Amino acid sequence: MAHYDLLVIGTGPAGQKAAIQAAKLGKKVGIVERKRVVGGVCTNTGTIPSKSLREAALYLSGFHQRSLYGASYRVKQDITMEDLTFRANHVINREIEIIQNQMTRNNVDLWFGTASFIDPHRLRIERADDLVEHTADIVVVACGTVPPRPSHLPFDDHSTTDT
């Protein structure tokens, strides 16, 4: 069991900022992520992927270059979903790499597992192959959100989905 000045639950934007800022102030910091990858919803399924898909579509369709090259200009004639997801995945993977490098550079300990409180200053982290416990003076809970799904809309993940 290690003791930290700050333990953070969640590696999304809020958790990242809390952990990095505390580390920059000389604090001993650890961060826990339930998923097998850092970044939270913003990086992996929300903001960055949706904006990357949008920008890939605009780029491949030649939308921004049409004023220069004419209305029929396209970077690629037939745009496939594979073309779009390739670019989005590249951006996502780069963001994940940046986050991991920030944690390493600032000496933030990172664990993948599910955190639960034993008491206000002690966490149990259930990992794939074991359990560990750590204590902290301060624990920040930054475990993110789930997009709303209004009951009057049929979310079938084909014609209606969320990011």
Each model region followed by its residue ranges:
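Glycine-rich flavin
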Residues: 2-4, 20-27, 33-163
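Short alpha-helical segment within the catalytic ATP-binding CA
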Residues: 17
